């Protein structure tokens, strides 16, 4: 076990910067696909439910990543004993999660709902793996496993029920928005110690 030192701080700051860049690009892409340069229709209103769903999951992920890195690696009062392998693991998992946001951002159009759902399902699966390993480390993130499982069940169930069928164009977007809105509220309530230490 190593103490927190300048090299660790530099590495965490580098990782957080890389994650921030990818997530900022994803947010920019999502906004660009909602607000277009078309004179006849600058706002793509049919994409609003998917954009809101994107924001509902984007904000808590971005905030929790920042808080987790600070509490786990930068704050000597809350940091567990430092192990380089966990820092590498966290960095890899967070970059993979950020990449999922970029894929989600490109699939806001209602006709691409399966791509959006797929990216959310991959994101939640990655987060379950990360949460399970982090929980075994002794860091309280257990509620996220349950929340991610609920999202997987609802979206996976919707995809399964929709196989071979044509759903009303906006229905999957509304299901997504409501599911992610409710699970985000639950996340903030159940994991408030990480979001607001």
Language-model regions: role of each:
Residues 1-71:
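N-terminal topogenic module of multi-pass integral membrane proteins
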Residues 5-15, 42-49, 110-116, 138-144, ...:
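Membrane-interface helix-boundary signature
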Residues 23-30, 53-64, 94-100, 123-131, ...:
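Helical transmembrane-bundle signal
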Residues 36, 61-88, 104-108:
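Helix-loop junctions on the outward
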Residues 37-38, 67-74, 165-170, 193-196:
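Juxtamembrane membrane-water interface segments of multi-pass membrane proteins
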Residues 84-152:
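Membrane-proximal helix-loop-helix units in multi-pass membrane proteins
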Residues 160-179:
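Interfacial loop-to-transmembrane junctions
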Residues 185-197:
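Juxtamembrane boundary at the C-terminal end of a transmembrane helix
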């Amino acid at each position: 076990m190593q103490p927190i030192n300048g090299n660790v701080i530099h590495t965490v700051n580098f990782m957080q910067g890389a994650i921030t860049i990818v997530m900022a690009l994803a947010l920019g892409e999502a906004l660009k696909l909602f607000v277009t340069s078309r004179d006849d229709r600058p706002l793509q209103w049919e994409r609003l439910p998917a954009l809101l769903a994107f924001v509902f999951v984007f904000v808590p992920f971005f905030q929790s990543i920042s808080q987790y890195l600070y509490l786990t690696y930068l704050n000597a009062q809350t940091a567990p004993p430092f192990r380089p392998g966990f820092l590498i693991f966290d960095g890899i998992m967070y970059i993979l999660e950020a990449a999922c946001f970029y894929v989600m951002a490109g699939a806001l159009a209602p006709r691409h709902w399966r791509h959006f759902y797929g990216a959310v399902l991959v994101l939640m699966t990655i987060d379950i793996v990360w949460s399970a390993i982090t929980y075994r480390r002794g860091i309280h993130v257990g509620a996220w496993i349950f929340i991610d499982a609920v999202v997987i069940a609802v979206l996976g169930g919707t995809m399964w029920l929709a196989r071979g069928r044509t759903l009303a164009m906006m229905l999957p977007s509304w299901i997504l928005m409501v599911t992610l809105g409710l699970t985000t509220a639950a996340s903030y309530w159940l994991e408030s110690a990480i979001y607001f230490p």
